[in-house]
């Protein structure tokens, strides 16, 4: 995912310890939602929260481990004849964090996408077996009367995920600007996507509001008794 940020990922202006605390709070919130859910075992509306908690913990632990990349006692000297120079280690820390942020974003999206598809299929909203997750979400938004802000949130979420798939922003429109919570996200063909803040701040921001959205959809689907998580059908055997 190529984006423009106000600060570099390892900028001293970003309080990373604060971001770790925020991620931990979101992971705990998701775990609490899972524990307190009234939905049955293996219902995707229950399981989605444990999946999101897992991805949030993965990101949080990755950030904590990244501190070792600029430590003279890090793993590099243990596996190399000589340690890398400090300047190189700082660059590697930035590369590591960029990869971590992108990896989290992609995996987080996969969990949410699977959740939305199962919701749509269970309620016959996806009668035409639509493949596009954006079109599926629009149908869900219409069915459950989701707000324009909800639609904008998922549009931003989806467009940034597509950058990884498509290698850039592609649309019939030359430019696309989406507003959410007072922030503007600018997508332009041939240019880096402009975020209103750094990748780690964006990850925390998007995760918080996606959790809000899923809580809302879960409430609106309470009349559906059971929506089976497709992971519950997977079996592994050893030969």
Name every feature range the model reports, one short phrase each:
Residues 1-100, 148-152, 159, 175-239:
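Extended intrinsically disordered or low-complexity regions, especially N/C-terminal cytosolic tails and loops
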Residues 5, 129, 133-136, 156, ...:
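Alpha-helical structural motif
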Residues 76-80, 102-135:
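Short, contiguous, well-structured surface segments enriched in hydrophobic/aromatic residues
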Residues 116-124, 162-173, 215:
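Charged/polar positions within long, soluble alpha-helices
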Residues 119-123, 144, 209:
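Alpha-helix C-terminal capping segments
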Residues 125-143, 173-190:
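Short, charged amphipathic alpha-helical segments flanked by flexible coils
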Residues 136-178:
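Short, mixed-charge amphipathic alpha-helical segments
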């Amino acid at each position: 995912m190529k984006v423009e940020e106000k600060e570099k990922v390892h900028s001293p202006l970003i309080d990373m310890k604060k971001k770790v605390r925020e991620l931990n709070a979101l992971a705990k919130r998701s775990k609490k939602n899972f524990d307190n859910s009234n939905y049955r075992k293996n219902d995707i509306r229950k399981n989605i929260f444990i999946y999101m908690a897992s991805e949030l913990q993965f990101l949080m632990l990755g950030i904590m481990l990244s501190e070792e990349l600029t430590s003279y006692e890090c793993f590099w000297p243990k596996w190399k004849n000589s340690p890398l120079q400090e300047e190189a280690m700082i660059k590697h820390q930035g590369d590591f964090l960029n990869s971590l942020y992108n990896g989290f974003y992609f995996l987080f999206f996969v969990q949410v996408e699977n959740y939305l598809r199962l919701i749509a299929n269970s309620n016959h909203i996806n009668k035409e077996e639509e493949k596009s997750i954006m079109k599926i979400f629009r149908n869900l938004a219409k069915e459950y009367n989701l707000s324009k802000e909800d639609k904008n949130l998922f549009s931003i979420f989806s467009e940034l995920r597509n950058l990884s798939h498509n290698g850039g922003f592609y649309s019939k429109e030359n430019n696309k600007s989406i507003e959410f919570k007072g922030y503007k996200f600018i997508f332009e063909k041939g240019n880096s996507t402009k975020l209103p803040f750094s990748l780690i701040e964006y990850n925390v921001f998007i995760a918080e509001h996606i959790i809000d959205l899923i809580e809302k959809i879960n409430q609106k689907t309470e009349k559906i008794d059971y929506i089976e998580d497709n992971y519950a059908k997977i079996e592994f055997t050893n030969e």
